[in-house]
Regions:
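Phosphate-binding site recognition
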Residues: 1-332
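A cross-kingdom feature that marks ATP-driven nucleic-acid transaction machinery
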Residues: 2, 297-424
């Protein structure tokens, strides 16, 4: 993969001069396995930051350093800065990789660790031959640590990698390996539940859940990891404000996508929360109609993560069924809403597929001031002046190309493109 190439190139570069890389990505995306794959067969030290006291953490790290690198540090180290200094000194003699996983958790251990790392890094980087990688899954904290001008580690990075879920073509291939006779319905269900997150695909495939019905059976079984996963992922991200954030995400997942609708249900202005969800947490996107101006007020909000969208649509609102152990009724709720909900996911699937496969410079949807005259997919190429305009329906027989053609005529900006109509 592209990320693996960047990591290997950085490793090579770090033999000459110290490199500092950050890798960010949601939990379960496969950061750790990718990092370990990139340093296979080389000298490396992997440290995992857990929420514990600094002396206890250092005790564990001291043991890890002795085992992985043979560094003997006499006496008991109780401050991370002392250990980090020893690791940097070691790298002036021997080249190796230092991976610190869940790096943002240092904030809960001792927040001054970041400035201590910065001081020591600035002091030793000229002579160190170290490939230092900080990996983290709480997006907001990682961005604050490395991209906020007021933070000590701002401007210290050699490179930054944001790990994304698998592309459509990749998880299609994976499903085909496990079930060569899969149907489009099976593929859509896999996309709807996992969004291409490797760990979720893995859980389903390893359990033999390669068909739609089996996938939904597994997700709604009493021991399903998918039931509590949404809460596990986000409570630590949001802290004590999580109640309001969860309510907003539940409303967006249920189809209330305009801020005024959200404000009236929540009973207060949700603007600041929505801005945080988009900028700090990267969980939502403010969608504007294609060709509209940046200051357009016709915005609609959507969730970026397919699994979380599914969780907020079906699992979170039905906690009472789960607490009563009525998993059969939870499955019934999903079955009833499946047709309509998966139709919306299908639009997203085709947007991802077109973005991956076609030569385009922009992609989105269209609706007018009244929220009418909707077009599911408009993909444009400003270099060739071509556009793909598509209507997406679960039942392609319901697509009327004449209506789509008349919608195209009503969007004056499309007049300068050679338009190809598609029914998907």
């Amino acid at each position: 993969t592209q990320e693996l190439e960047i990591l290997r190139r950085t490793w090579e570069q770090s033999k000459q001069s110290a490199c500092f890389t950050v890798m960010v990505g949601r939990r379960r995306i496969g950061k750790t396995s990718l990092l370990l794959e990139s340093v296979k067969g080389t000298k490396y030290l992997y440290l995992f930051v857990s929420r514990t006291s600094e002396p206890l953490l250092c005790q564990q790290f001291q043991k890890d350093a002795a085992e992985a690198l043979g560094i003997q540090i006499f006496g008991t180290i109780t401050r991370f800065r002392d250990l980090f200094e020893q690791l940097l000194i070691f790298s002036t003699k021997k080249h190796y990789t230092l991976i610190i996983d869940e790096f943002q958790e240092f904030a809960n251990v001792n927040s001054s660790i970041f400035s201590e790392i910065q001081n020591l890094w600035d002091q030793y980087k000229g002579k160190a031959k170290i490939n230092f990688i900080a990996s983290g899954s709480i997006y907001s904290m990682m961005m604050k640590i490395f991209e906020n001008r007021k933070e000590p580690l701002f401007g210290r990075l050699t490179s930054k990698i944001t790990l994304q879920p698998f592309a459509v073509s990749v998880f299609k291939e994976i499903l085909n390996d496990y079930n060569p006779r899969y149907t489009p319905e099976d593929l859509l269900c896999l996309y709807m539940l996992t969004g291409g997150v490797p760990k979720y695909i893995d859980l389903l495939m390893e359990a033999g859940a390669t068909k739609k019905s089996k996938m939904l059976d597994m997700v709604t079984s009493p021991d399903s990891p998918f039931i509590s996963e949404g809460k596990d992922l986000l409570v630590s991200e949001f802290g004590k404000e999580y109640g309001t954030y969860f309510s907003i995400l539940q409303l967006i997942a249920s189809g209330k996508t305009i801020q005024s609708e959200l404000d009236s249900v929540i009973g207060k202005n949700t603007g600041a929360y929505l801005a945080n969800l988009e900028r700090e947490y990267s969980l939502t996107t403010k969608n504007r109609p294609m060709f509209s101006r940046p200051e357009s007020r016709k915005n609609r909000w959507s969730l970026n993560d397919n699994y979380l969208q599914f969780w907020f649509r079906f699992i979170f609102p039905n906690q009472s069924l789960i607490e009563m152990g009525k998993y059969d009724l939870l499955r019934e709720v999903i079955d009833r809403g499946y047709e309509q909900y998966s139709g919306l996911v299908l639009e997203k699937y085709f947007r991802s597929k077109i973005a991956e496969e076609e030569r385009i410079t922009g992609i989105g949807s269209y609706w007018n001031n009244k929220g009418e005259n909707e077009i599911d997919v408009i993909a444009i190429n400003d270099l060739d002046k071509t556009a793909i305009v598509a209507e997406v329906k679960r039942n392609p027989k319901k697509i009327d190309m004449n209506i789509l053609q008349s919608k195209v005529h009503s969007v004056k900006e499309l007049a300068k493109y050679k338009v190809e109509l598609q029914g998907l």
